Amino acid sequence: WYQRQITDRKTPFTLKGGGTKMIPIARPRIVVEGGEVFYIFRDEERGSRVSMAHASDVGISKWTITDLTDFSVDAWEPSHDTELWKEQRKLHLFVQHTRQGDGERTAEIDPQMVYVLETDMNINK
């Protein structure tokens, strides 16, 4: 196991209180092949864009971060086509602009388009 800090977040947040919480960072999706790691996330500090951190060797490489969208996806949580990754090493992300209310409140939002973001695996090399 390796323990590495990927970003240097500054915004504090808490999960205290009742109900679900709108947090400023998504739970990441981590995709690995050998020692190479792709860390897909959304962070309010980066404009809530779809972002990807990459290390060619998790043990020694410096992380590079790239925003994969130039627009906010608000409360989006990463997900990818796991079988396409396993079979063809293609990283395709399911993306939809979403919102989440705080403390079991709903957030008003019109229906949003759903799309597949096909990443360029050489983007950070």
Give, region by region, the residue ranges found by the protein language model.
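Extracellular, repeat-based ectodomains that mediate carbohydrate processing or recognition
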Residues: 1-125
